A protein has these predicted regions:
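Ligand-binding clefts/hinges and TM-proximal coupling segments of bilobed small-molecule sensing domains
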Residues: 147-164, 168, 244-276, 317-318, ...
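Secondary-structure end/capping motifs
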Residues: 233-312
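N-terminal secretory signal peptides that target proteins for export/translocation
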Residues: 1-9
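Boundary at the C-terminal end of the N-terminal hydrophobic targeting segment
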Residues: 25, 31-33
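Bacterial N-terminal signal peptides
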Residues: 12-26
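Short, glycine-/small- and polar/acidic-enriched structural segments
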Residues: 34-186, 190-196, 209-218
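Conserved C-terminal helix/tail region of periplasmic/extracytoplasmic solute-binding proteins
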Residues: 304-337
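Pocket-lining segment of extracytoplasmic ligand-binding domains
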Residues: 170-267
Length: 337
Protein backbone atom coordinates (compact mmCIF):
# COMPACT_ATOMS: atom_id res chain seq x y z
CA UNK A 1 0.00 0.00 0.00
CA UNK A 2 1.22 3.47 -0.92
CA UNK A 3 1.94 5.82 1.97
CA UNK A 4 -0.88 8.27 2.65
CA UNK A 5 -0.24 11.74 1.21
CA UNK A 6 -1.83 14.45 3.42
CA UNK A 7 -1.84 17.05 0.61
CA UNK A 8 -3.46 14.65 -1.88
CA UNK A 9 -6.13 13.74 0.69
CA UNK A 10 -6.87 17.40 1.32
CA UNK A 11 -7.29 18.09 -2.41
CA UNK A 12 -9.64 15.11 -2.81
CA UNK A 13 -11.71 16.31 0.12
CA UNK A 14 -11.92 19.81 -1.41
CA UNK A 15 -13.14 18.37 -4.72
CA UNK A 16 -15.80 16.32 -2.90
CA UNK A 17 -16.99 19.43 -1.06
CA UNK A 18 -17.20 21.46 -4.30
CA UNK A 19 -19.20 18.70 -5.99
CA UNK A 20 -21.50 18.38 -2.98
CA UNK A 21 -22.14 22.12 -3.01
CA UNK A 22 -22.78 22.11 -6.75
CA UNK A 23 -19.79 24.35 -7.46
CA UNK A 24 -17.91 22.03 -9.78
CA UNK A 25 -19.39 20.95 -13.08
CA UNK A 26 -22.91 21.85 -11.97
CA UNK A 27 -25.55 23.31 -14.29
CA UNK A 28 -25.74 27.11 -14.37
CA UNK A 29 -28.16 28.76 -11.97
CA UNK A 30 -30.43 31.67 -12.91
CA UNK A 31 -28.11 34.02 -11.04
CA UNK A 32 -25.10 32.79 -13.00
CA UNK A 33 -27.00 33.12 -16.28
CA UNK A 34 -27.84 36.69 -15.31
CA UNK A 35 -24.15 37.38 -14.72
CA UNK A 36 -23.32 36.12 -18.21
CA UNK A 37 -25.87 38.33 -19.92
CA UNK A 38 -24.43 41.20 -21.92
CA UNK A 39 -24.57 44.30 -19.74
CA UNK A 40 -25.42 47.24 -21.96
CA UNK A 41 -26.09 50.92 -21.26
CA UNK A 42 -28.31 52.78 -23.70
CA UNK A 43 -29.04 56.50 -23.48
CA UNK A 44 -32.21 58.26 -24.56
CA UNK A 45 -33.00 61.96 -24.58
CA UNK A 46 -36.35 61.42 -22.88
CA UNK A 47 -39.12 58.88 -22.59
CA UNK A 48 -41.37 60.22 -25.33
CA UNK A 49 -43.34 58.41 -28.02
CA UNK A 50 -40.21 58.03 -30.20
CA UNK A 51 -38.67 55.93 -27.41
CA UNK A 52 -41.56 53.45 -27.49
CA UNK A 53 -39.65 50.49 -29.05
CA UNK A 54 -36.87 50.98 -26.49
CA UNK A 55 -39.32 51.04 -23.58
CA UNK A 56 -41.27 48.10 -24.98
CA UNK A 57 -38.11 46.01 -25.37
CA UNK A 58 -37.34 46.65 -21.71
CA UNK A 59 -40.82 46.29 -20.21
CA UNK A 60 -41.88 43.30 -22.31
CA UNK A 61 -38.70 41.34 -21.49
CA UNK A 62 -37.40 41.32 -25.06
CA UNK A 63 -33.89 42.46 -24.10
CA UNK A 64 -33.76 39.71 -21.46
CA UNK A 65 -34.99 37.10 -23.95
CA UNK A 66 -32.08 38.05 -26.20
CA UNK A 67 -29.58 37.56 -23.36
CA UNK A 68 -29.11 41.21 -22.48
CA UNK A 69 -29.09 43.12 -19.21
CA UNK A 70 -29.93 46.64 -20.39
CA UNK A 71 -29.81 49.86 -18.39
CA UNK A 72 -31.64 52.85 -19.87
CA UNK A 73 -30.13 56.23 -19.01
CA UNK A 74 -31.75 59.60 -19.77
CA UNK A 75 -29.15 61.95 -21.25
CA UNK A 76 -29.79 65.09 -23.31
CA UNK A 77 -29.20 64.56 -27.04
CA UNK A 78 -26.50 67.24 -27.02
CA UNK A 79 -24.56 65.46 -24.24
CA UNK A 80 -24.98 61.85 -25.36
CA UNK A 81 -22.14 61.85 -27.97
CA UNK A 82 -19.61 62.86 -25.29
CA UNK A 83 -20.94 60.11 -22.99
CA UNK A 84 -20.60 57.61 -25.84
CA UNK A 85 -17.05 58.72 -26.60
CA UNK A 86 -16.11 58.50 -22.91
CA UNK A 87 -17.47 54.98 -22.46
CA UNK A 88 -20.21 56.04 -20.03
CA UNK A 89 -22.80 54.52 -22.38
CA UNK A 90 -22.61 51.86 -25.08
CA UNK A 91 -25.32 53.09 -27.45
CA UNK A 92 -27.38 56.20 -28.14
CA UNK A 93 -31.05 55.42 -28.74
CA UNK A 94 -31.45 57.99 -31.45
CA UNK A 95 -30.33 59.19 -34.85
CA UNK A 96 -30.72 62.93 -35.20
CA UNK A 97 -28.96 66.26 -35.67
CA UNK A 98 -26.93 65.94 -32.44
CA UNK A 99 -25.56 62.45 -33.16
CA UNK A 100 -24.95 63.13 -36.85
CA UNK A 101 -23.27 66.46 -36.08
CA UNK A 102 -20.97 64.72 -33.59
CA UNK A 103 -20.05 62.10 -36.19
CA UNK A 104 -19.28 64.72 -38.82
CA UNK A 105 -17.21 66.61 -36.22
CA UNK A 106 -14.96 63.60 -35.66
CA UNK A 107 -16.73 61.17 -33.31
CA UNK A 108 -16.11 57.68 -34.76
CA UNK A 109 -19.76 56.60 -34.59
CA UNK A 110 -22.44 55.48 -37.04
CA UNK A 111 -26.23 55.30 -37.22
CA UNK A 112 -26.99 51.57 -37.30
CA UNK A 113 -30.79 51.25 -36.99
CA UNK A 114 -33.90 53.38 -37.56
CA UNK A 115 -37.00 53.18 -35.39
CA UNK A 116 -39.08 55.42 -37.66
CA UNK A 117 -38.24 56.73 -41.09
CA UNK A 118 -40.78 59.52 -40.86
CA UNK A 119 -41.67 62.03 -38.16
CA UNK A 120 -45.24 62.55 -37.01
CA UNK A 121 -45.85 66.29 -37.47
CA UNK A 122 -48.76 68.35 -38.76
CA UNK A 123 -48.75 71.99 -39.79
CA UNK A 124 -51.78 73.41 -37.99
CA UNK A 125 -53.36 76.85 -38.16
CA UNK A 126 -55.81 79.07 -36.35
CA UNK A 127 -59.45 78.51 -37.43
CA UNK A 128 -59.64 81.43 -39.88
CA UNK A 129 -56.67 80.18 -41.93
CA UNK A 130 -57.88 77.35 -44.16
CA UNK A 131 -54.94 76.90 -46.56
CA UNK A 132 -51.22 77.50 -47.08
CA UNK A 133 -52.18 80.48 -49.22
CA UNK A 134 -53.98 81.98 -46.22
CA UNK A 135 -50.78 81.69 -44.17
CA UNK A 136 -48.69 83.82 -46.53
CA UNK A 137 -46.91 86.51 -44.54
CA UNK A 138 -48.00 84.89 -41.27
CA UNK A 139 -45.95 83.41 -38.44
CA UNK A 140 -45.42 79.66 -38.16
CA UNK A 141 -43.96 78.27 -34.93
CA UNK A 142 -41.59 75.31 -34.70
CA UNK A 143 -40.22 73.82 -31.48
CA UNK A 144 -36.61 74.55 -30.64
CA UNK A 145 -34.40 76.60 -32.91
CA UNK A 146 -34.66 77.20 -36.63
CA UNK A 147 -32.63 74.76 -38.72
CA UNK A 148 -33.56 71.74 -36.62
CA UNK A 149 -34.99 68.49 -37.93
CA UNK A 150 -38.64 69.53 -37.72
CA UNK A 151 -38.00 72.95 -39.26
CA UNK A 152 -36.16 71.47 -42.24
CA UNK A 153 -38.86 68.81 -42.63
CA UNK A 154 -41.45 71.61 -42.83
CA UNK A 155 -39.40 73.48 -45.43
CA UNK A 156 -39.13 70.33 -47.57
CA UNK A 157 -42.88 69.67 -47.24
CA UNK A 158 -43.70 73.26 -48.21
CA UNK A 159 -41.51 72.93 -51.30
CA UNK A 160 -43.24 69.67 -52.26
CA UNK A 161 -46.59 71.43 -51.88
CA UNK A 162 -45.53 74.17 -54.27
CA UNK A 163 -45.22 76.77 -51.52
CA UNK A 164 -42.23 78.99 -50.80
CA UNK A 165 -40.86 79.07 -47.26
CA UNK A 166 -39.95 82.73 -47.77
CA UNK A 167 -43.66 83.51 -47.90
CA UNK A 168 -43.93 82.63 -44.21
CA UNK A 169 -42.26 83.91 -41.05
CA UNK A 170 -40.72 81.00 -39.15
CA UNK A 171 -40.52 81.39 -35.37
CA UNK A 172 -38.55 79.07 -33.09
CA UNK A 173 -40.22 78.52 -29.71
CA UNK A 174 -38.25 76.77 -26.93
CA UNK A 175 -39.80 74.21 -24.62
CA UNK A 176 -42.28 71.39 -25.09
CA UNK A 177 -44.85 70.92 -27.86
CA UNK A 178 -47.58 72.26 -25.59
CA UNK A 179 -45.91 75.68 -25.80
CA UNK A 180 -46.73 75.75 -29.52
CA UNK A 181 -50.39 75.14 -28.77
CA UNK A 182 -50.33 78.01 -26.28
CA UNK A 183 -48.77 80.22 -28.96
CA UNK A 184 -51.59 79.30 -31.36
CA UNK A 185 -54.30 79.86 -28.78
CA UNK A 186 -52.95 83.28 -27.84
CA UNK A 187 -52.64 84.28 -31.53
CA UNK A 188 -48.92 84.91 -31.05
CA UNK A 189 -48.55 82.82 -34.21
CA UNK A 190 -51.02 81.88 -36.93
CA UNK A 191 -49.59 78.41 -37.61
CA UNK A 192 -47.50 75.80 -35.79
CA UNK A 193 -45.79 72.50 -36.54
CA UNK A 194 -47.18 70.12 -33.91
CA UNK A 195 -46.80 66.42 -33.10
CA UNK A 196 -49.04 63.96 -31.17
CA UNK A 197 -50.61 64.02 -28.67
CA UNK A 198 -50.73 67.83 -28.81
CA UNK A 199 -52.02 67.54 -32.38
CA UNK A 200 -55.22 65.93 -31.15
CA UNK A 201 -55.81 68.60 -28.51
CA UNK A 202 -55.32 71.33 -31.11
CA UNK A 203 -57.75 69.68 -33.53
CA UNK A 204 -60.42 69.38 -30.82
CA UNK A 205 -60.01 73.08 -30.08
CA UNK A 206 -60.89 73.93 -33.68
CA UNK A 207 -57.46 74.44 -35.23
CA UNK A 208 -57.00 73.27 -38.82
CA UNK A 209 -54.70 70.53 -40.12
CA UNK A 210 -53.13 72.01 -43.23
CA UNK A 211 -50.20 69.73 -44.01
CA UNK A 212 -49.20 66.22 -42.97
CA UNK A 213 -45.46 66.88 -42.94
CA UNK A 214 -44.48 63.41 -41.72
CA UNK A 215 -46.09 61.66 -44.68
CA UNK A 216 -44.20 63.88 -47.12
CA UNK A 217 -40.65 63.79 -45.74
CA UNK A 218 -38.35 60.89 -44.91
CA UNK A 219 -36.58 61.77 -41.67
CA UNK A 220 -35.48 59.33 -38.96
CA UNK A 221 -37.23 59.47 -35.62
CA UNK A 222 -35.49 57.44 -32.96
CA UNK A 223 -32.95 54.77 -33.83
CA UNK A 224 -29.58 53.55 -32.65
CA UNK A 225 -26.05 54.98 -32.85
CA UNK A 226 -22.87 53.12 -31.87
CA UNK A 227 -19.13 53.63 -31.97
CA UNK A 228 -17.34 52.14 -34.97
CA UNK A 229 -15.15 50.06 -32.65
CA UNK A 230 -18.27 48.55 -31.04
CA UNK A 231 -19.69 47.66 -34.45
CA UNK A 232 -16.41 46.03 -35.45
CA UNK A 233 -15.47 44.27 -32.19
CA UNK A 234 -18.93 43.29 -30.86
CA UNK A 235 -21.11 42.50 -33.89
CA UNK A 236 -22.99 39.76 -32.01
CA UNK A 237 -23.95 42.14 -29.20
CA UNK A 238 -24.90 44.89 -31.65
CA UNK A 239 -27.17 42.49 -33.53
CA UNK A 240 -28.83 41.43 -30.26
CA UNK A 241 -29.64 45.06 -29.47
CA UNK A 242 -30.98 45.67 -32.98
CA UNK A 243 -32.97 42.42 -32.93
CA UNK A 244 -34.51 43.33 -29.57
CA UNK A 245 -35.59 46.77 -30.76
CA UNK A 246 -36.87 45.50 -34.10
CA UNK A 247 -38.81 42.69 -32.38
CA UNK A 248 -40.33 45.23 -29.98
CA UNK A 249 -41.35 47.36 -32.95
CA UNK A 250 -42.98 44.36 -34.63
CA UNK A 251 -44.92 43.63 -31.43
CA UNK A 252 -46.04 47.27 -31.29
CA UNK A 253 -47.44 46.96 -34.81
CA UNK A 254 -49.29 43.74 -34.04
CA UNK A 255 -50.64 44.54 -30.56
CA UNK A 256 -52.47 47.86 -30.28
CA UNK A 257 -54.18 47.10 -26.95
CA UNK A 258 -50.93 45.98 -25.32
CA UNK A 259 -49.08 49.02 -26.68
CA UNK A 260 -51.78 51.48 -25.63
CA UNK A 261 -51.55 50.10 -22.09
CA UNK A 262 -47.78 50.71 -22.19
CA UNK A 263 -48.28 54.28 -23.42
CA UNK A 264 -50.81 54.97 -20.65
CA UNK A 265 -48.47 53.60 -17.98
CA UNK A 266 -45.10 54.91 -19.16
CA UNK A 267 -45.98 58.14 -20.95
CA UNK A 268 -48.81 59.10 -18.56
CA UNK A 269 -51.48 59.74 -21.20
CA UNK A 270 -55.16 58.97 -20.92
CA UNK A 271 -56.61 56.05 -22.88
CA UNK A 272 -58.10 58.13 -25.70
CA UNK A 273 -54.94 60.17 -26.30
CA UNK A 274 -52.83 57.00 -26.10
CA UNK A 275 -54.97 55.29 -28.74
CA UNK A 276 -54.78 58.27 -31.09
CA UNK A 277 -51.03 58.60 -30.51
CA UNK A 278 -50.56 54.90 -31.28
CA UNK A 279 -52.46 55.23 -34.57
CA UNK A 280 -50.27 58.15 -35.65
CA UNK A 281 -47.01 56.64 -34.43
CA UNK A 282 -47.35 53.23 -36.06
CA UNK A 283 -47.65 54.86 -39.50
CA UNK A 284 -44.14 56.33 -39.07
CA UNK A 285 -42.35 53.09 -38.20
CA UNK A 286 -39.56 51.92 -40.49
CA UNK A 287 -40.58 48.42 -41.69
CA UNK A 288 -37.10 46.85 -41.57
CA UNK A 289 -35.16 49.29 -39.38
CA UNK A 290 -32.42 49.53 -42.00
CA UNK A 291 -31.04 53.10 -42.21
CA UNK A 292 -32.02 54.69 -45.53
CA UNK A 293 -30.21 57.25 -47.59
CA UNK A 294 -33.08 59.71 -47.97
CA UNK A 295 -33.45 60.07 -44.20
CA UNK A 296 -29.73 60.59 -43.68
CA UNK A 297 -29.57 63.12 -46.52
CA UNK A 298 -32.40 65.14 -44.96
CA UNK A 299 -30.62 65.12 -41.59
CA UNK A 300 -27.49 66.45 -43.27
CA UNK A 301 -29.62 69.07 -44.98
CA UNK A 302 -30.97 70.17 -41.59
CA UNK A 303 -27.40 70.73 -40.38
CA UNK A 304 -26.34 72.53 -43.54
CA UNK A 305 -29.38 74.81 -43.17
CA UNK A 306 -27.63 76.05 -40.03
CA UNK A 307 -24.50 76.83 -42.06
CA UNK A 308 -22.62 73.74 -40.86
CA UNK A 309 -20.63 71.25 -42.96
CA UNK A 310 -21.48 73.17 -46.13
CA UNK A 311 -17.94 72.93 -47.50
CA UNK A 312 -17.99 69.18 -48.12
CA UNK A 313 -19.88 66.45 -49.91
CA UNK A 314 -21.00 63.95 -47.27
CA UNK A 315 -21.36 60.27 -48.11
CA UNK A 316 -23.95 57.98 -46.50
CA UNK A 317 -21.18 55.72 -45.15
CA UNK A 318 -19.63 58.62 -43.22
CA UNK A 319 -22.73 58.71 -41.04
CA UNK A 320 -24.43 55.32 -41.23
CA UNK A 321 -23.56 51.62 -41.34
CA UNK A 322 -26.53 49.54 -42.46
CA UNK A 323 -24.84 46.13 -42.62
CA UNK A 324 -25.83 44.63 -39.26
CA UNK A 325 -29.41 45.95 -39.44
CA UNK A 326 -29.63 44.34 -42.89
CA UNK A 327 -28.42 41.02 -41.48
CA UNK A 328 -30.96 41.15 -38.66
CA UNK A 329 -33.78 42.06 -41.05
CA UNK A 330 -32.97 39.05 -43.22
CA UNK A 331 -32.77 36.76 -40.16
CA UNK A 332 -36.21 38.01 -39.05
CA UNK A 333 -37.66 37.15 -42.44
CA UNK A 334 -37.94 40.58 -44.06
CA UNK A 335 -37.55 40.83 -47.81
CA UNK A 336 -34.43 42.93 -48.24
CA UNK A 337 -33.11 43.93 -51.70
Amino acid sequence: MLPRNPLRSLLLLAVQVFVALGLLGAPSTDAESQERRSKVRISNAGFTITALPLLAARDWGIFTANGMDVELIVIAASLAPAALAGGDIDYIAGVGPASVSATLSGLPARAIWFSSDRISYWLMSRPQFKSLEDLKGKKIAVSGGLGGTNHVALVIALEKSGANQKDHVMVGIPGQQIQLLYALESAFVEGALISPPVTFNAYKKGFNKLLDVGSMVEMPGGGLTALVKTIQSKPTEVKKVIRSLQSAKDEIRKSKAKTVDLIVRILKMDKEASSETYDAFQTTLSPTGIPNRAGIENLVRSLQAQGRFTDRKIAFTEIADDRLATEVAKELGYKVP
